[in-house]
């Protein structure tokens, strides 16, 4: 019985650790909007001038990181998706550049450094 309790405790700790990482993980970065975005880029560029360059802007854009995705029809697509599919229109991208992306989703310092 103690073995089962230990496994239950380990599973609970693992779930709590994963939840903490999901909510507080730095993978997405901080959200920067308007003046905060400009200051974050300024600071990042000041630091990156002293360090080696990261990825180029064209590399980032090639990864489709800052582009909208085309609509795809699936079996469980909503009525709105079906209407767009039938009309031949594409949904408008929810962001148009790195500034919008950083405001909506957040950016890491390495992502901000591509504009330097």
UniProtKB/Swiss-Prot annotation:
Its main location: secreted. Expressed at high levels in the radial nerves. In the radial nerves, detected in the peripheral area proximal to the tube feet but not at the side of the hemal sinus. Expressed at low levels in cardiac stomach and pyloric caeca with trace amounts in the ovary, testis and tube feet. Keywords: Cleavage on pair of basic residues, Disulfide bond, Hormone, Secreted, Signal. The keyword Lipid metabolism does not apply. InterPro entries: Insulin-like_sf, Insulin_CS. Residues 1-29 form the signal peptide. It comes from the Eukaryota. Residues 51-90 form a propeptide. It is found in: Secreted. GO terms for molecular function: hormone activity. Disulfide bonds join 33-103, 45-116, 102-107. One of its GO terms (biological process) is positive regulation of ovulation. SUPFAM superfamilies: Insulin-like. The keyword Disulfide bond applies. GO terms for cellular component: extracellular space; plasma membrane. Induces oocyte maturation and ovulation in vitro in ovarian fragments and induces spawning behavior and gamete release in vivo. Probably mediates its effects by binding to a G-protein coupled receptor located in follicle cell membranes. Following receptor binding, stimulates GTP-dependent adenylyl cyclase activity in follicle cell membranes of fully grown ovaries at stage V but not in young ovaries at stage IV, leading to the production of cAMP. This stimulates the production of the maturation-inducing hormone, 1-methyladenine, in stage V but not stage IV ovaries. Heterodimer of a B chain and an A chain linked by two disulfide bonds. Belongs to the insulin family. This is Gonad-stimulating substance. It comes from Patiria pectinifera (Starfish).
